[in-house]
Amino acid sequence: MAATTRTVKGQAYWAKVMVPDKEYQTFNIEILLDKSKQEEFKALIQSEIDKKVEMHTEGKKKPKVEHFPWRIVEDAEGMETGEIRFKFNMKKSFVTRDGETVEQHPQVFDAKGNLITDKSFRIGNGSVVKVAYFMAPYLNKGKAGVSLRLKAVQVIDLVHYGVNSDPKAFGFEEEEEGFSYDKEQMDRALESETEDF
């Protein structure tokens, strides 16, 4: 098996790491890396594909690369944002060469390294995470690709599931002028109003 490695910190999206996706029976997570790290990670993935191709196609026709484990993010109007999300997955189970079905699931840890086993725990979009994974390049019928196989997730900064705090998800951008929310100031204003009654 390929060596397990880790990503740098990134923002999590569409994480299903405690309970598998019902339709495909896989655990999944996408992460958005800083733009400075995106090209570096893409190059690392491409090098793994190139190694696999060179190893198995010497003197033969090069296969077409059909699968990269990332997708380009689009805004609400369908325009590319320049951001890339990398996709990691793990099958809920697999069958060994001996015909034995093996169940598996990713390990999930908090920032302090404590294992999280609560099946109701959810990672909301925008949470800051690191992902442990290994690359699985493949060749099949003249085509090549690579999958990023999920092993574990460390949650550094949790955004609670169901609370989408990423304005870009709704097509909003930061405005230079206008309202800026200050929780302490709002709390003081509410206290003042309450005292008046």
Roles of regions detected by a PLM:
Residues 1-97:
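OB-fold ssDNA-binding interfaces and closely related basic DNA-contact patches used
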Residues 1-4, 160-197:
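Acidic, gly/ser/pro-rich intrinsically disordered tails
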Residues 33-35, 135-137, 157:
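Beta-strand elements of well-folded, non-transmembrane domains
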Residues 89-99, 116-119, 162, 169, ...:
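Signature of extracytoplasmic/envelope-associated structural regions
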Residues 94-111:
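Short, basic/aromatic beta-hairpin or loop at an interaction surface
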Residues 109-129, 136-146:
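Exposed beta-sheet edge/beta-hairpin loop segments within beta-rich domains
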Residues 140-160:
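OB-fold/S1-family single-stranded nucleic acid-binding modules
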